[in-house]
């Protein structure tokens, strides 16, 4: 017996190891997170990560630049936090993974803001200066928001497309693709916004429902004899009539120059009260009903027989200015799904119309193009000059009616193109623009841009995989890229073009380099103020400065050139490992970057593309002001903490829509608390543990501790495989299960007795603490990519001598001998424990026992279950959290059972176990023999648990 004298005071004489930790139960995230943001910045944590990562293999996530305009919204938060999780997880996986954030700075939205604030009459130099200042102000505002979300990066030196070096390198990239033969100038219908006064990129177009007039119009016979012969008739039985078209754009009728028929569709000559009408045979019945006519088909012929016939313009009778005829051209794009099977062609206002007319010999100068950039007809247009096309629509209908050419006029609801900025309808409009040719043979005679880009898509990894087919289809079907824009605040297409021929100056490549050098020093303003004579001397009499600017998608689409290999080449490299954006960027940044890199380098600028969905409310509805269902990330961060936003994003399958609501945030917060409570338990029970002095080698651990570490190591391997594939939601799901079930529901539950009641420095307790130390090392690191604030807070308590968790790599768990067999055995034991817990709960419900420690259980088991249980010996009771446990072998699984009885022994005051030896020591009548030994002797001996 020990000679220790026990204190006679009952509360002080039987202490248990209930320890505290400075890691609080309440996260108080809205208050603490901003302090961490300041701390990370003040101590240069991002720079420390970079220093720690030197010499490792590079991993480059290239930031797709948000536009420098407006506050950050929830979509920004999703995007930036996903990127942050990727970068942090790659750094911890042993890579050098820098994060250089960037901003898209030129373009229409900022120019519109300047116009709103200062009017439209500012000199160009002032527009530039104010646009730069505005973009800078917006960047600083957004930067604060991104940092508040816990995103670490090169915030002191981000890339900006408006930085002089980036602007200059973009001009050099333009020179390269001209040199390679991809760029040409031509008249083509492009997406045109009247409010922007400029061409739009495909990615700047959105579709909205709209109601427009729909009309069926008669083009009268101009060659009745030829028409009769085409239908196999000697002559037409009557002179009245013609060919019928259907359109939803009456405003294009004044510019009609042709009619398109499908060569293989059968067309009918129909005798009606309105004369002879030509239309597709399979549309006759529907059209007669729509027109309110009765008709009889008197002849049929395939479309090819009608080629080159001419018909009078439908407004010829309304004004002499329309006394012209329209030829019939053949086109495979004509269908009979709707309308009459005849398409009226205004080549200035439709891509297929334009292509067809050009293919049939029409020159650019032949094309009638009366709509100006502001949406008004030129003043000289007969009947409608000076009107906007939308105001002209009803007047054109009236004029057609007066001319006897209108067969039907109704309203038609359909999905129509709109400008993504102004939300106003746009049109196709033929303008002289600079294009990158998708099917143009490059100067080296190699593959076309389309072929190269499609090959690059095939060579790219997609997350999720369906993105490959989507981008492939977009590239396969897209038209030539309209590179030019008619704005001020943009990188100039710094060409000198011949005043008469429009040809580029023969020294264009050399001149572009000269301009780039000036832009490098002074920004794009250098081009605005440049006197042409400075560069081309007397040639300035023949050549003028091109006024077009580059599409802003070329700005961001060449960041692989002017950022990865330009402004930040010391940190980054080409190609990037990953581009990560919303799924709309298949037709945006992913797309433009692919095309520019295909032209410049013959490959994609990325090895992988990751796309995430958009945020929706709890009912799956898109967030909008009208529905009032928007959620502001600032408000959530200030109320619940940015950590809750991070955990919500990490726990959601980003490949689809990301649903968020107050109810969802409540569930996320509850999940966060469970993780935090687990960390608090771990840290508290390690607060008197010094790994260097107190740790035991794995061979001396109790069996359950070896199992716990083996299990944690196995889990980590699974988690790292998910991280490798950017699968974050399974990481969160498995870690939440680990914290709540594997740790809280089992291992830590079993461990409490040993941690609290064993002698502080006993091998049994140090075994448990050594295992907890390893589990905590591993757990904090796998949490860090998404629970960054919490992992850092816990790490500073756990490893106070370390600067930050973010310079660590994933933990190397100690090797556990026979780990696989150990995990299998304890999986079986946990299964049995589940049966016992159920039986204990039934006994508690029946008021046969109070707590589980009041119970003594007998487990009847067979086979491997018996072997596993029996191997624990007397430690089985600790695993089952009962005061006594015995195991009885039975022959068959069907004979297995759990018997629960209330203990008849007294309860130990200290450990709360019911034991026969409580009071065995007269000086300590309320203490069991186990606790007496742990307090005053050498302590109990355990082997398993």
Swiss-Prot record:
Pfam families: Anticodon_1, tRNA-synt_1, zf-FPG_IleRS. A motif ('KMSKS' region) lies at residues 622-626. Its EC number is 6.1.1.5. It catalyses: tRNA(Ile) + L-isoleucine + ATP = L-isoleucyl-tRNA(Ile) + AMP + diphosphate. It is found in: Cytoplasm. Signal peptide: none annotated. IleRS has two distinct active sites: one for aminoacylation and one for editing. The misactivated valine is translocated from the active site to the editing site, which sterically excludes the correctly activated isoleucine. The single editing site contains two valyl binding pockets, one specific for each substrate (Val-AMP or Val-tRNA(Ile)). This is Isoleucine--tRNA ligase 1. It comes from Burkholderia pseudomallei (strain K96243).
């Amino acid at each position: 017996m020990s000679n220790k004298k026990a204190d006679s005071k009952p509360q002080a004489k039987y202490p248990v190891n209930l320890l505290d930790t400075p890691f609080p139960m309440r996260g108080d995230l809205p208050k603490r997170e901003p302090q961490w943001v300041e701390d990370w910045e003040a101590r240069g944590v991002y720079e420390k990560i970079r220093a720690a990562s030197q010499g490792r293999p590079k991993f480059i996530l290239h930031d797709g630049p948000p536009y420098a305009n407006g506050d950050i919204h929830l979509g920004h938060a999703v995007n930036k936090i996903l990127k942050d999780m990727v970068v942090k997880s790659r750094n911890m996986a042993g890579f050098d993974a820098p994060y250089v954030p960037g901003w898209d700075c030129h373009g229409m939205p900022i120019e519109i803001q300047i116009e709103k604030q200062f009017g439209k009459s500012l000199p160009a130099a002032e527009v530039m200066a104010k646009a730069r200042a505005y973009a800078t102000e917006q960047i600083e505002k957004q930067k604060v928001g991104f940092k508040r979300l816990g995103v670490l990066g090169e915030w002191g030196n981000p890339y900006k497309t408006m930085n002089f070096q980036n602007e200059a390198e973009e001009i050099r990239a333009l020179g390269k693709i001209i040199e390679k033969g991809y760029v040409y100038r031509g008249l083509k219908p492009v997406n045109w916004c009247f409010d922007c006064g400029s061409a739009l990129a495909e990615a700047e177009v959105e579709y909205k429902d709209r109601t427009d007039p729909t009309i069926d119009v008669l083009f009268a016979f101009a060659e009745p004899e030829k028409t009769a012969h085409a239908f196999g008739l000697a002559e037409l039985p009557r002179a009245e009539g013609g060919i019928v078209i259907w359109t939803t754009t009456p405003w294009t009728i004044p510019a009609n120059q042709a009619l398109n028929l499908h060569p293989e569709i059968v067309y009918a000559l129909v005798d009606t009260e309105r004369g002879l009408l030509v239309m597709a045979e399979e549309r006759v019945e529907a059209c007669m009903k729509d027109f309110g006519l009765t008709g009889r088909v008197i002849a049929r012929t395939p479309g090819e027989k009608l080629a080159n016939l001419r018909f009078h313009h439908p407004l010829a009778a309304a004004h002499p200015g329309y006394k012209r005829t329209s030829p019939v051209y053949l086109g495979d794009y004509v269908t009979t799904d709707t309308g009459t099977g005849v398409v009226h062609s205004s080549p200035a206002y439709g891509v297929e119309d334009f292509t067809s007319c050009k293919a049939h010999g029409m020159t650019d100068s032949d094309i009638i193009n009366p709509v100006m950039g502001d949406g008004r007809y030129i003043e000289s247009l007969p009947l409608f000059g000076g009107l906007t096309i939308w105001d002209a629509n009803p007047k054109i209908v009236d004029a057609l009616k007066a001319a006897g050419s209108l067969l039907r006029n109704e309203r038609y609801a359909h999905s129509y193109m709109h400008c993504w900025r102004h939300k106003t309808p746009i049109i196709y409009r033929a303008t002289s623009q600079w294009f990158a040719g998708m099917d143009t043979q490059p100067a080296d005679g190699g593959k076309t841009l389309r072929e190269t880009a499609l090959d690059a898509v095939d060579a790219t990894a997609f997350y999720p995989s369906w993105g490959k087919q989507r981008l492939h289809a977009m590239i396969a079907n897209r038209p030539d890229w309209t590179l030019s824009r008619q704005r001020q605040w943009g990188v100039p297409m710094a060409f000198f073009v011949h005043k008469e021929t429009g040809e580029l100056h023969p020294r264009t490549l050399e001149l572009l380099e000269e301009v780039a050098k000036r832009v490098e020093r002074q920004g794009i303003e250098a081009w605005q103020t440049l006197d042409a004579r400075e560069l081309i001397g007397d040639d300035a009499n023949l050549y003028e400065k091109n006024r077009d600017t580059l599409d802003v998608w070329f700005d961001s689409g060449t960041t692989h050139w002017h950022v990865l290999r330009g402004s930040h080449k010391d940190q980054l490299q080409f190609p990037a490992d990953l581009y990560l954006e919303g799924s709309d960027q298949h037709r945006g940044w992913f797309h433009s970057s692919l095309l520019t890199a295909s032209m410049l380098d013959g490959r994609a600028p990325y090895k992988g593309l990751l796309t995430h969905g958009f945020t929706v409310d709890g009912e799956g509805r898109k967030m909008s002001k009208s529905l009032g269902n928007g959620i502001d990330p600032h408000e959530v961060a200030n109320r619940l903490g940015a950590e809750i936003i991070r955990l919500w994003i990490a726990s959601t399958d980003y490949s689809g829509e990301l649903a968020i609501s107050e109810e969802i945030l409540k569930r996320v917060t509850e999940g966060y608390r469970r993780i935090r409570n687990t960390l608090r338990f771990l840290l508290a029970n390690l607060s008197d543990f010094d790994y260097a002095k107190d740790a035991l080698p794995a061979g001396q651990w109790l069996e359950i501790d070896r199992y716990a570490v083996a299990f944690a190591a196995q889990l980590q391997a699974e988690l790292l495989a998910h991280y490798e594939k950017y699968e974050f939601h399974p990481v969160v799901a498995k870690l939440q299960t680990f914290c709540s079930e594997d740790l809280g529901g089992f291992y830590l539950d079993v461990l409490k007795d040993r941690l609290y009641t064993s002698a502080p420095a006993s091998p049994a307790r140090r075994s448990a603490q050594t295992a907890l130390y390893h589990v905590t090392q591993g757990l904090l690191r796998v949490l860090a990519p998404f629970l960054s604030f919490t992992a850092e807070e816990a790490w500073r308590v756990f490893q106070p001598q370390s600067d930050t968790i973010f310079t660590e790599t994933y933990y190397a768990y100690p090797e556990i001998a026979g780990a696989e067999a150990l995990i299998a055995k304890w999986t079986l034991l946990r299964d049995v424990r589940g049966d016992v817990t159920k039986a204990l709960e039934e006994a508690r419900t029946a008021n046969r026992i109070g707590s589980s420690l009041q119970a003594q259980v007998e487990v009847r088991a067979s086979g491997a279950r018996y072997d596993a249980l029996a191997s624990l010996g007397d430690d089985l009771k600790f695993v089952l959290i009962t005061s006594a446990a015995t195991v009885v072998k039975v022959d068959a699984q069907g004979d297995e059972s759990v018997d629960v009885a209330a203990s008849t022994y007294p309860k130990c005051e200290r450990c709360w176990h019911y034991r026969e030896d409580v009071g065995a020591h007269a000086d300590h009548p309320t203490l069991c023999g186990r606790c007496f030994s742990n307090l005053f002797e050498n302590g109990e001996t355990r082997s398993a648990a």
